[in-house]
Amino acid sequence: LALWVIKVANGKTRRVFVYMLAFVGFASAFLDNVTAILLAVPMSLQIARRMKTSPVPLIIGQVILSNIGGAATLIGDPPNIIIASRAGLSFNDFLIHMAPGAIVASWAVIGLLVWMSRKELKGGVDPADLDDIKPAAAITDRPLLNKSLIVLGLVLAAFVAHAWLPLEPSVVALIGAGALILIAQVPVKKWAKDIEWKTLVFFAGLFIMVGALVNVGALAE
C-alpha cells in the first residue's frame, strides 16, 4: 500500500503527505485510532526510506488526523459507541451528524499541516525510479487479501444497516473478526497473543469505576 501511494502520487513528497493523511483520516472512521496508527506508521517509515525524507511530520499529522477521523462514525472510537448507546443513536444517525464536521476539520488540518511542513515537503522520487516500484509484488497472499476485503465490506455494510438488523455493532464486529480468523486459519495462540489485553483490562476497570461513581451519586454532586 505504501508503494502504491508513492506510485499514485508520481513520487511527489507533498502529494504523498496529503494522500497518507487523508488515508489515515478515512481509516480511523472505520478502525479505532490505535489500529489506524499501527497500520499507517510502518507505511510512513517505508515511504520515508524510499523518498529519503524524515517521517516525523507525516507521523505527527497522522496522529492528529486519526483523532479527527475517529469522530466521524459510531465505530471510529470506543467513546463514540458509548455515547451513541446512551443517546439511542444508530450508525447512520451518528454518521449524518458527525461526518460532515469531521471531513471539514480534516481537510482544514491537512492544509495547515502542509503549510507548516512546506520545507520538508519539497522534492520527491526521481521519475526514472518510479518504474522500479512494483506495489503488486509486495503482496504475499492475494487470495487471503481478497477474502479479507470481502469480509471487511460485509462488516461495513452491516454497520450501515444495523438499524434494521437484530445485531449490535459490537456483535457485527465480533462476527467479522471470527470469520477472518476462520478464513485465515490463524492458530488460537497467535491471535490471542496479539490482542491488547492490557488495554482491554484498563478500559474495563475504568468503566467499572465510572459506573460505581454514577451509582453512588458522586458525579451528580
What residue spans do the PLM features occupy?
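Transmembrane helix-loop junctions in multipass membrane proteins, especially transporters and channels
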Residues: 11, 37, 89, 114-126, ...
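Alpha-helical transmembrane segments of multipass membrane proteins
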Residues: 69, 105-109, 113, 155-158, ...
